[in-house]
């Protein structure tokens, strides 16, 4: 079917140039069955969506099951709100046993949500507090630990600029806006921003205040060092803690939060796209950052209990020390012999050119780009008429 539709699309390209009517492509079985499926689902207020195909059919055609699984999702259909719980497909769980308890956890959460609702309450958020209010919050004696998170305008922590920083506990979070998503706007007057930074410096240097965060011992640490000139301590990185608890599973905060809390899908939208990179307003980004902090604070106690029950305290200390070394190595960098690098670059570029010429000679296509999946697809399956390997036994 795909091969036939590719041929139709090629023909339509020429027909458009010739001013002729285009030929409709052949619909897939999923597209043919979609109207009936939607009609059958219309009477159900609660849906368990197992696997990517089910998530695409019930939530959004671009939905990703790994980005949405375990996250309670509400969809508006025909004036009604439908509750959908995306879960891994049972076949995947049977093949990959490490997902078994994740699958059971998602089902348990779905049953609770469908029957009585979830008990997760969003944190109370204070946006852009004054220096005085921020200091009062960060010096409260009844708080045993704080979690924090930063949002930036880039992925590389040595060059990224900080947009906001959030600090808090499971139910209360303060978000300090620094740089607008437009790259120019600020949230404090210059003199007040200086005061805010001084309060934050005192907080991060206060050894009596335990700090925690997800990947905070690496990315967030380097951002804070570059921005404030201080190293946060003492610090617990929940990503390292979860690595000891469940070494074979993903360690992203979205995954950990979906497993240990009843929070909705705050990391991604319904299409599975990360909100950290796609927020349209400063408020959306700041709210996202606040949720990161609250959920990190919520999962930390249970993760630490599991580490203690496994007697992994020595391992977690070792992991944090290694992380410190890695962060310092990233900051310092390494010496590069530029003369030798340039020599190796020339050798590799010549090898690439020679291989490209050889490939084009073999294929008889002087314009072939070996890095183009589209061109290779047409070459392998249209021109050479090869059969794509469907099973492991067919691979050569």
Regions found by a protein language model. Give the residues of each.
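Hydrophobic "anchor" residues on beta-strands that sit immediately upstream
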Residues: 85, 145, 210-211, 233
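A polyanion-binding, active-site-adjacent surface
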Residues: 1-118
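Conserved "right-hand" nucleotidyltransferase catalytic core of DNA-directed polymerases
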Residues: 109-186, 218, 248, 260, ...
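Metal-dependent phosphoesterase core characteristic of DEDDh/y 3'-5' exonuclease domains
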Residues: 59-71, 84, 88-94, 168-170, ...
